Amino acid sequence: EGKSTLVKAIMGEIDYEGTLQLGHNCLIGYFAQNQAALLDGELTVFQTIDEIAVGDARTRVKDLLGAFMFSGDTIEKKVKVLSGGEKTRLAMIKLLLQPVNLLILDEPTNHLDIKTKDILKDALKAFDGTIILVSHDRDFLDGLADKVFEFGNKRVRGHFEDINGFLKNK
């Protein structure tokens, strides 16, 4: 009830009433629910990442792909033949390579298996910035979120505790 709408407002995708103010020098990276569908199916896995990697990241492309379970012949596969989970992992690598300080993730664990969720969670823990994460996946949020914003009855309530504290006190 309003979570994805908030994300769309922050991203400037919809009109809204009121004021929305982002911090100074805020650089946003956005992972939409359909992010994997936006990949170029004709590129290989390696080409998809290599085309956006700049500077120091260029030397780490294969390591980064390996961290997200792409190795060997897999990196030469065309994106169009990848499974939904593989495409989601690839889209997440693209996002993590962008020079951003605010990540907005709208249901990023859809189509992911447990191992991939763990890899993503570790990558997000290592992110040096702010994360706005829309998710119903309590296990994924455990140990990742330190504030919870509850949407309901046309209101947003902030809870300055982790997901377990929020659920316990609800």
Predicted feature locations:
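ABC ATP-binding cassette signature C-motif
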Residues: 1-170
